[in-house]
Amino acid sequence: MKKRIILAIVSSVSLLLAACGQEDSTSSQNSSQQEIVSTSQESSEGQSSSKEEKKEQTEAYYTSDTGSVTKVDAQTHEVVDTIAIDGSAHNVQISPDEKVIGVTIVPSEGHAEDSSDSNESMEMEHDEDSDTSMSNESMEMGQDEDSDTSMSNESDDEKGIAAFYDTETGEKLAEVEVGSHPAHIVFTNDGSYAAVSNNGENTVSVIDVSTYEVVETIPTGEGPHGFRIAEDGKTAYVANMGEDTVSVLDLESMEEINRITVGSTPATTGITSDGQTLLVTLNGENALAIVDLTTNKVEKVAVGNGPIQLFVQHDDQYVFVANEGTEENPSNTVSKVDLNSNEVVETIEVGSGAHGVVISEDDQYTFVTNAFDDTVSVIENETNEVIATVEVGETPNGITLK
């Protein structure tokens, strides 16, 4: 029985969230959640050995605008560590070697989690992605991060922070000054650099992780928010919420090399592993833009209300889009889009204000932060059902797995 409980990723994943004021779940809630997860795990025993051989996820990190990053054990649904942050934590990502957590921080009020608040480029409250920010991203967050609706270019010149923490000890390794209203943070696949989108000043800061120094600041379009870096580490695709475009950045020459018009209020991006297809959430028109990067042709797929972050499955078969809506008109769904047919094949009901989204490495589970009801939903991807709902801190946004 113990082996069966350990089998699935949900029982081995610990969630790290940025949230303060975390409320402890009652023992009865923990028990019922564990039973749900255990049942799901037992039913998955017949899955192929190739999936079982894939690396298991063990922890997840996500942030909240209440000023902390919190680690939660997914089996017990208990907080095991909380990192207090001086400011508003927006988005988070773990380094490729899983030793470092990067967090974007707005020193005072700023990026809240509400995609609604304006169209992310006005991301006042929006996302891993996020989130997610690109839940992508969205906006994490959630974000994922990410209240992903662009904080907009306020004339606030106060610089933001990218902070880095040891995943084992929670010790702060470095604090780097970046631009105004930092939104999302993404590591290159080799772990050499971390890039931060500065929503308030239309730039991306590139940080050398070996020295924790900004080595370049790259101009972008208006209101940069969620973004992803291609697998080869050479190109970043940044959603500009303020001007309906995506900036294409060359990370070798450290300059913008193209700008693609995609649609209203792009919140975050995703890219397939072959680097041929770009996915962009269009918060202003409730759609997902699918861009053929060989031609820059854009196809749009209608999704839910107020899409923020997205995450592409590792096998490139599906993309999951978190639909946050607004505080006045919240959404509580995730759209699952088939990338072969470019159609929504499932609409999954989660918590209110779906924001950050991330998928386990074996593609079996999707984790979604729900910004308006302070929970995380765990989706079993084969059945498209929510198998666990975890109570977390206030306004969770960006989310990333270890």
What are these regions (language model features)?
Residues 4-12, 16, 21-402:
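Predominantly soluble domains enriched in secretory-pathway, periplasmic, or organellar proteins
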